[in-house]
Amino acid sequence: MDIKKGDLVLVISGKDKGKRGKVISVLPSEEKVIVEGVNIVKKHTRPNAKMRQGGIIEKPAPLYRCKVMLICPHCNQPTRIKHTFLEDGRKVRVCSKCKEIIDRV
């Protein structure tokens, strides 16, 4: 999966189209990501040991990875990702627009 935890992404379709947010977690088996402040759903909960009072909780729900696009930290634009190998053999992500390495080296 091209998107990692901590990346800044742009939502490209759906009800939150145009919003930017940081990736909280990645679910590679489901090909989904959870983005901070995007796709907020209300969940009705009952009282339990953790929460003595039940109620309605707002939390971010997962988005399919095809609905988000990575924002390059160098050119600050949404971009597709290319992969390349460095001289030491490491595989890194590269911005297709500015050709800079995206991975935190």
From Swiss-Prot:
Entry superkingdom: Bacteria
Keywords tagged on the record: Ribonucleoprotein, Ribosomal protein, RNA-binding, rRNA-binding
Gene Ontology CC terms: ribonucleoprotein complex; ribosome
Keyword RNA-binding set for record: yes
InterPro entries per UniProt: KOW (IPR005824), Rib_uL2_dom2 (IPR014722), Ribosomal_uL24 (IPR003256), Ribosomal_uL24_CS (IPR005825), Ribosomal_uL24_KOW (IPR041988), Translation_prot_SH3-like_sf (IPR008991)
A molecular function GO annotation: structural constituent of ribosome
Gene Ontology biological process terms, A to Z: translation
Subunit text: Part of the 50S ribosomal subunit.
Record's function text: One of two assembly initiator proteins, it binds directly to the 5'-end of the 23S rRNA, where it nucleates assembly of the 50S subunit. One of the proteins that surrounds the polypeptide exit tunnel on the outside of the subunit.
PANTHER family (alphabetical): MITOCHONDRIAL RIBOSOMAL PROTEIN L24 (PTHR12903)
Family: Belongs to the universal ribosomal protein uL24 family.
Listed name of the protein: Large ribosomal subunit protein uL24
Gene: rplX
